[in-house]
């Protein structure tokens, strides 16, 4: 039996000059706390497209996905919840905040992390990993070959692997 009952969220890890973009929430249970630009995946939307959309909606920045930095999964109140964090190369740096959702932003280095009121320790860990990535899950977009949006994320730089995998 197939089930699509999943709370699917995404975050944008945007690095510039060794610092990460963080935002301060303006509403909800996280009001006043800091974290990555984030949000939910809409119906019919890929998680990577959602990360780019949320970044643009919250901060006015466009970017391109480089890969996945980390993932959080849990079961809360009987519902599966998955949160994917994407490393994104900024294509613009002119921040224009959505003041309804975000009250402030900043570019932070690791040295500033202890003074930040984080949304969660998981959010802090994702930001830390983004600034010092050991290895990211690289995106292989094979949508053209498949005929619909289709991406594979692998911990490799060997693109030949994809040609050897039957889809």
Which ranges hold each PLM region?
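Active-site-adjacent beta-strand/loop module that shapes the phosphate/pyrophosphate-binding cleft
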Residues: 73-95, 106, 112, 126-133
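Short, charged/polar surface micro-motifs in flexible loops or helix N-caps
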Residues: 15-20, 29-30, 42, 89-94, ...
